[in-house]
Regions:
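An N-terminal hydrophobic leader/cap segment in hydrolases
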Residues: 4-52
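Alpha/beta-hydrolase superfamily serine-hydrolase fold, recognizing
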Residues: 6, 42, 47-54, 58-327
Length: 327
């Protein structure tokens, strides 16, 4: 099945100017192009609130988005880690995505402006996200929420960070979030089509918005040294023990090179005892949650996100399966 023409046009508009730039040599240019192609166009119901969270000797900026009162899901908060390969993206370029997230879910959204590579390599961005998560989970009432109603959510590199934050919380004895939503996450350490165990790297790794080579380049900028490639907080799929993790929703994109590793991470979470739901969004490329205008894949994704947030925890965990239903 080929990607539909409307989706090709939408993705092309979203990534114009960035797809052919050498990210390793001109990452700052890619950041500038990303900001230019992701202006805030949506008007929030309420003015966002900028705040900072202490992390060691520095402060981490966060931006809080509040939903319309009539559509609000009382007490529910999404802690959002943006994508961009750990190298690009910020709370400004993701403002529209967060505004849409509040509209579509009724949740408050806290977006974390973690430090970016290569100026701040692994685990700097992860530590920022962990500090933000622990502060918000410990002080959820300050944000009008409760610890059990705080859900981690991240797309792409942000999905990687959300998974790693949950693992780190368990290992450090911190508060493990009750839920996490991983949107087309990066979970593995090898995206070479010749050596990767995942077929989607080969079938989807060329000619699309996100290529296998671009993923390898992002990881080269993110890691501090070669040893990081074997670190489960760098590549969560390498974790030997996935017990004690949150209830999880994994959403992947049909034509994404990261598709198979995201789904495999969901399956392993389920096998380790976490209640896990996996859904593959058809006719979609990587990064679809940021598409403007609510195209069908984005509406479908939010349908699953809302079902996940609404779902009663009383149901027993079942073996995870990949849903490939139509949009």
């Amino acid at each position: 099945m080929a990607l539909s023409k409307p989706m090709r046009y939408a993705i092309a508009a979203l990534t114009r100017g960035t797809e052919k730039v050498d990210i390793k040599e001109k990452y700052e240019l890619v950041r500038q192009l990303t900001r230019a192609t992701h202006p805030q166009l949506l008007k929030p119901s309420y003015r966002p609130w900028d705040h900072t969270i202490q992390c060691g000797d520095h402060e981490v900026p966060v931006r809080i988005f509040t939903p319309d009162g009539e559509k609000r899901r009382p007490g529910s908060l999404l802690l959002f880690f943006h994508g961009g390969g750990w190298v690009t993206g910020d709370i400004d370029s993701y403002s529209d995505s967060c505004i849409m997230m509040t509209r579509m879910t009724g949740c408050s959204v806290v977006s974390v402006d973690y430090r970016l590579a290569p100026e701040y390599r692994f685990p700097a961005g992860l530590e920022d996200c962990y500090a933000a998560a622990q502060m918000i989970l410990q002080n959820a009432d300050t944000f009008g929420s409760f610890p059990e109603q705080v859900t981690l959510i991240g797309d792409s590199a942000g999905g990687n960070l959300a998974a790693a934050v949950s693992l780190l919380a368990r290992e450090r004895g911190g508060i493990v979030p009750s839920r996490q939503i991983l949107l087309y996450p990066s979970t593995y350490n090898d995206h070479n089509p010749e050596t990767s165990p995942f077929e989607s790297v080969r079938s989807n790794g060329q000619g699309n918005m996100l290529t296998a080579q671009r993923i390898e380049d992002y990881m080269a900028l993110y890691r501090s040294d070669e040893a990081d490639l074997q670190n489960p907080y760098f590549a969560p799929l390498l974790a030997q023990d996935l017990s004690g993790q949150p209830e999880t929703l994994v959403l992947t994109a049909e034509f994404d090179p990261l598709r198979d590793e995201g789904e495999e991470y969901g399956r392993r979470l389920a096998n380790a005892g976490s209640r896990t739901f996996i859904y593959r969004v058809p006719d979609c490329l990587h990064g679809f949650i940021s598409l403007p205008g609510l195209p069908a894949p984005v509406r479908e994704a939010y349908r699953h996100i809302n079902e996940f947030l609404d779902r009663a925890k009383a149901e027993p965990p079942t073996k995870s399966a990949v849903d490939t239903g139509d949009c």
